[in-house]
Amino acid sequence: MSFKKLLPPIKNALQSLKIDTPTSFQKLLIPKIKSGVDVIAIAEEGAGKTTTLIINTIQKLNGVAYEDVPRALILVQNKEAALALEEEFNKFTKYTDLRIFCAYEESTIQFQKDTIYTGVDIVIGTPKRLNKIYFQNGINLTGLQMLLIEDADFLEGTSFHTEIHRIAESLNKCQFVVFSNNYTSKIEKLQDLFLEHAEVIEL
């Protein structure tokens, strides 16, 4: 597998970033996620998980803004992780018109609800804040195509899996993708709750 079958805006971004060849992990994972199946992806740091998440999200959304409701929801540990992922996304979306927004505890919930209402394609946020926004009717998930968890190791020692499950069980047809350095007890719990058919890819 190469990057040849990706959308032109993604290939242009990869070229500008001087990324020519996928990692062995990306060769396995990118086509698997593109196929639409639920995936739990386990690999060490440096395998290319974040880039894979970004590429597949843009690919799934066809690289274009569409209507007002979010089509991808990405769960992260905290504000710092959200902003870092947004920065990486910006490197890959510069040839698209996709709209990205971050939601976390250190900002007013009304501002976040208002911004989401005006129209975004990708929302990056913490489970706690997104759960609160959702149950205040501040985000419409009827058009959601992907629910992703970046670096799911952060779930250990928290109750976030409960908040994630609340969102997941409210969705209709949606692809779930989880990235992690390790296969943990909380990922196993997510499998029991709503990822029973997910393919586990471990490198």
Predicted features and spans:
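Conserved nucleic-acid-binding Ia/Ib motif block in the N-terminal RecA-like helicase ATPase lobe
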Residues: 67-129, 144
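Conserved pre-motif I regulatory segment
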Residues: 1-42
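Conserved catalytic network of the ASCE P-loop NTPase/AAA+ motor domain
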Residues: 32, 63-68, 93-95, 114-118, ...
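Walker A/P-loop NTP-binding motif
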Residues: 27-39, 49-67, 90
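Conserved RecA-like ASCE ATPase "motif II neighborhood" in helicase/translocase motors
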Residues: 126-140
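The conserved Walker
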Residues: 43-47
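Post-DEXD/H (motif II) to motif III coupling segment of the RecA-like Helicase ATP-binding lobe
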Residues: 141-203
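Hydrophobic/aliphatic anchor position in the core parallel beta-sheet
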Residues: 39, 72, 100, 146, ...
